[in-house]
């Protein structure tokens, strides 16, 4: 199955892209894709990530389906 992965802010900088399309096996959890991305792009692992699946906040254990959109971003804070 194919998953569109969108990167925002620091996650885009860490990966060097705003969007990637990844192949995944059926019943893959979002965390599995994030772990693989972190191995391929070690700078990504330095960030505490928030995720959304199909434009809704999601848990890392969310099972992805073919054609889903996984968005990765960091929490925004100010001071």
Where are these regions (language model features)?
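Ubiquitin-like/PB1-type beta-grasp interaction modules and other compact soluble beta-rich domains
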Residues: 1-78
């Amino acid at each position: 199955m194919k998953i569109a992965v969108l990167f925002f802010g620091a996650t885009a900088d860490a990966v060097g892209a705003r969007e990637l399309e990844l192949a995944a096996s059926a019943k893959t959890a979002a965390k599995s894709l994030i772990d693989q991305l972190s191995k391929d792009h070690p700078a990504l692992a330095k960030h505490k990530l928030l995720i959304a699946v199909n434009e809704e906040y999601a848990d890392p254990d969310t099972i992805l389906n073919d054609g889903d959109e996984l968005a990765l971003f960091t929490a925004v804070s100010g001071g």
